[in-house]
């Protein structure tokens, strides 16, 4: 079930933390530190029972020690809190390079062996566990999807808070302690992530506890937050809306049990405050709380040798990765490593058979409350299919009555109505995210059934529209936050969509890349991770109709980023081009049913023609591309003089206008529309692509193909390089030309306008025969541009064109091309 309630959340402890638990946490810390070092350094003899030699050390030492002991300490206490309070909890490890802590945790709580039975709970299993870490044929170095309990790898830094807050949305029983490295805190996404506390509601959402892991250093430099004054540091977090607590340890000779007692007491104080916030949220008190956060100030590399080779190591940047880089190569480093590992007294922590002693784990949670077993961290286990409304009720039916090419419809408005009713049917498992663009991208029908969630004060109904402390729409002007919120919402079993201006999807190129890698690893080799809902991204306000914002807003290149993920038959990315509103609806339905994908859906928001019916759309979407027989005039491929192909709404509009003119000249052509770009890829590279036989039948085996493409032409060239007839393809795409100008001028400067396409088609057929017509078309392009320069709007021959199949009365004759009122939403 989605949003499961596990345990008895938000209950205060009615007694002090037991001394047995304190001792257990110290033993956990020691065993986790020992196992973390073992993962980085050892390939054999995991408990040093046999004579311990340099041959037991790995040849290549890979890993990060510096953050790991602090993470192990915190994990000990989080485990204790979960057990004592029976608190439903997911753990976020921002500094994911502390991966040894995460894998050690899941080994200690037993879930690692449950998912990987070959890693047994004995000396042989421990040796495999150590050896596999960052090793050929083994596991990665970070808190990767291979690790039970992880929903955040923490490889690319910056997204910890975005993922933490996305996980708690509509998940009121969930507690998410989120560890943030003080280096990560310098990244842009993390800096804005602090503001997430204004976008959640403690009544309907869970609670995030940010824990700043302030160990003072990055790879080779101090961290900014570690060097400002305590007053400035605390004031910063108060300004972000938090109540900061600070814990300092490891800089003197304080006994470790004393440190654990102090931290356990502080952790209970913090959790009591959280319980009070949750209790107050059930009353009529609507005041936004100052949520607690913890500054955890400890030495980098805590408990490692204080000096190595005469240089300060513990408490310095030198502890960041592998403090003893020559442990196999030099006796001096090896002896230091041996003494370091012996300092944790493994003989007190492991049984004779190599299993962990029961008194180490007695304080830890059991069953699904274990960090590695919580179903929220394997969201596919609790995911339920969306209750989707029938799509037919949203169809633009005018195309049936008035003909192909009818109307002036803003396609995303239809999607907005569809999302509205999805929210109605799934009120606590579907969200819409946007970087201040939900209305601009025409999804505002959602406000008919929900609000924008906002817990940051209200001024007046005159200016604060569609806002409430609870709602299924979340807006923050941060593409990072939108993508991060949605990813975590999906990773914990729910569904959603977010929209962005096309050019600014590039802001989160690398986030898409990271999520794709998570999905790739999952579908290749982690069968126990059940499929999660797909990232659905509406890419609107696109290059061809950004005429009111200009060159900076004109970049469709996210297609190229996603195409890099289409190999190996992992099938984790899709690129869809919605030709019209009906196409967009069918694409959305398919995407909302899909799992383990990143679905990029390209759809303009300006008024545009409706070309095909919903039934026609479904057939085309199934195939990925289709001939529009009603638009073709060639009866067979043998009769074709040129294939006119398009992907994208504006390229389709211009190809259709060109086809109208070519038809009047008697040119024989077929019209092909592409909706699912990746279906064009060679079937040798992609087993879901169309076959070479189908490709040749669609595009012909030997006729020239003029392909008008929404994005950069090299996308298509790269996809079809090994296809039949690929040498006969002429691809026209965005050529990095644009400005704040008119719709015609945008297509003109990129040779995408109908006149340029008509001329190019004639050139491909017989350049000499049609030389005069080609010159005439090129001259008209100059005339049309000059008209726009002189008048400030496009020439009527361009704006008044309507596809000849359209049958309308005088009151609805305005063409979609002429509907250029701009974007005032």
Curated annotation (Swiss-Prot):
GO terms for molecular function: fructose-6-phosphate phosphoketolase activity; magnesium ion binding; phosphoketolase activity. Keywords: Lyase, Thiamine pyrophosphate. Its EC number is 4.1.2.22, 4.1.2.9. GO terms for biological process: carbohydrate metabolic process. It is an enzyme of class 4 (lyase). Signal peptide: none annotated. Its cofactor is thiamine diphosphate. It catalyses: D-xylulose 5-phosphate + phosphate = acetyl phosphate + D-glyceraldehyde 3-phosphate + H2O; keto-D-fructose 6-phosphate + phosphate = acetyl phosphate + D-erythrose 4-phosphate + H2O. Disulfide bonds: none annotated. Gene3D superfamilies: 3.40.50.920, 3.40.50.970. Belongs to the XFP family. Phosphoketolase using both fructose 6-phosphate and xylulose 5-phosphate as substrate. Homohexamer. PANTHER family: PHOSPHOKETOLASE-RELATED (PTHR31273:SF0). This is Xylulose-5-phosphate/fructose-6-phosphate phosphoketolase. The gene is xfp.
């Amino acid at each position: 079930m989605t949003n499961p309630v596990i345990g008895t959340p938000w209950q205060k402890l009615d007694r002090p933390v037991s001394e047995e638990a304190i001792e257990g946490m110290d033993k956990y810390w020691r065993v986790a530190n020992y196992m973390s070092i073992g993962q980085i350094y050892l390939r054999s003899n995991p408990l040093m029972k046999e004579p311990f030699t340099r041959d037991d050390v790995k040849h290549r030492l890979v890993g990060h020690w510096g953050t790991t002991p602090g993470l192990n300490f915190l994990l000990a206490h989080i485990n204790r809190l979960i057990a004592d309070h029976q608190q439903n909890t997911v753990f976020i490890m921002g500094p994911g390079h502390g991966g040894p802590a995460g894998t050690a945790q899941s080994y200690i709580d037993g879930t690692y062996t449950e998912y990987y039975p070959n890693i047994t709970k004995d000396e042989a299993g421990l040796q495999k566990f150590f050896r596999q870490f960052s090793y050929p044929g083994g596991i990665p170095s970070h808190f990767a999807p291979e690790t039970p309990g992880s929903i955040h790898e923490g490889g690319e830094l910056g997204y910890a808070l975005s993922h933490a807050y996305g996980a708690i949305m509509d998940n009121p029983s969930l507690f998410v302690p989120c560890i943030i490295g003080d280096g990560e805190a310098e990244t842009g996404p993390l800096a804005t992530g602090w503001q997430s506390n204004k976008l959640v509601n403690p009544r309907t959402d869970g609670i995030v506890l940010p824990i700043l892991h302030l160990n003072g250093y990055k790879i080779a430099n101090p961290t900014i937050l570690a060097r400002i004054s305590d007053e400035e540091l605390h004031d910063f977090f108060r300004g972000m809306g938090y109540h900061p607590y600070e814990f300092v340890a490891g800089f003197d000779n304080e006994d470790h049990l004393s440190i654990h007692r102090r931290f356990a007491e502080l952790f209970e104080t913090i959790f009591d405050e959280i319980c009070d916030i949750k209790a107050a949220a059930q009353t009529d008190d609507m005041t936004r709380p100052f949520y607690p956060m913890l500054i955890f100030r400890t030495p980098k590399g805590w408990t490692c040798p204080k000096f190595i080779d005469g240089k300060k190591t513990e408490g310095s940047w030198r502890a960041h990765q592998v403090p003893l880089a020559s442990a196999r190569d030099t006796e001096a480093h090896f002896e230091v490593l041996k003494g370091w590992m012996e300092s944790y007294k493994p003989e007190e922590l492991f049984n004779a058979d190599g299993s962990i002693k029961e008194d180490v784990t007695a304080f830890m949670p059991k069953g699904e409350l274990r960090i590695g077993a919580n179903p929220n961290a394997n969201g596919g286990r609790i995911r339920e299919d969306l209750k989707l409304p029938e799509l037919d009720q949203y169809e633009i039916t005018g195309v049936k009555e008035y003909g192909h090419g009818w109307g002036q419809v803003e396609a995303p408005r239809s999607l907005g109505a569809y999302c509205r009713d999805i929210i109605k049917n799934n009120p606590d498992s579907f969200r819409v995210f946007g970087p201040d663009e939900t209305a601009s991208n025409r999804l505002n029908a959602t406000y008919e059934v929900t609000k924008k969630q906002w817990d940051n004060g209200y001024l007046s109904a005159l200016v604060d529209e569609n806002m409430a402390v609870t709602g299924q729409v979340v807006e923050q002007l941060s593409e990072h936050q939108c993508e991060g919120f949605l990813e975590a919402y999906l990773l914990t079993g729910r569904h959603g969509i977010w929209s962005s201006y096309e050019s600014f999807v590039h802001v989160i190129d690398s986030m898409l890349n990271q999520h794709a890698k998570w999905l790739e690893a999952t579908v290749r080799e982690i069968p126990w991770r059940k499929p999660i809902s797909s990232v659905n991204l509406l890419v609107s306000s696109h290059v061809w109709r950004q005429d009111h914002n200009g060159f900076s807003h004109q970049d469709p290149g996210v297609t190229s980023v996603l195409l890099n993920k289409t190999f190996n038959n992992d099938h984790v990315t899709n690129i869809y081009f919605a030709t019209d509103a009906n196409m967009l609806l069918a694409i959305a339905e398919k995407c909302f049913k899909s799992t383990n994908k990143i679905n990029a859906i390209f759809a303009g928001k300006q008024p545009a023609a409706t070309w095909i019916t919903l039934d026609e759309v479904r057939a085309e979407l199934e195939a990925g591309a289709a001939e529009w027989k009603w638009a073709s005039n060639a009866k067979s491929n043998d009769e074709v003089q040129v294939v006119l192909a398009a992907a994208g709404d504006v390229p389709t509009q211009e190809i259709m206008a060109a086809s109208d003119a070519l038809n009047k000249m008697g040119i024989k052509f077929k019209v092909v529309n592409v909706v699912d770009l990746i279906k064009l890829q060679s079937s040798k590279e992609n087993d879901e692509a169309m076959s070479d036989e189908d490709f040749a039948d669609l595009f012909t085996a030997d006729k020239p193909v003029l392909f008008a493409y929404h994005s950069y032409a090299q996308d298509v060239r790269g996809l079809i390089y090994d296809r039949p007839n690929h040498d006969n393809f002429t691809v026209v795409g965005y050529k990095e030309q644009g400005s704040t100008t008119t719709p015609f001028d945008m297509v003109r400067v990129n040779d995408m306008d109908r006149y340029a396409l008509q001329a190019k088609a004639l050139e491909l057929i017989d350049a000499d025969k049609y030389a005069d017509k080609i010159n005439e078309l090129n001259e008209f392009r100059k005339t049309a541009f000059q008209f726009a320069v002189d008048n400030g709007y496009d020439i009527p021959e361009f704006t008044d064109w309507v596809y000849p199949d359209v049958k309308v009365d005088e009151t609805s004759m305005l063409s979609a091309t002429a509907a250029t009122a701009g974007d005032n939403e």
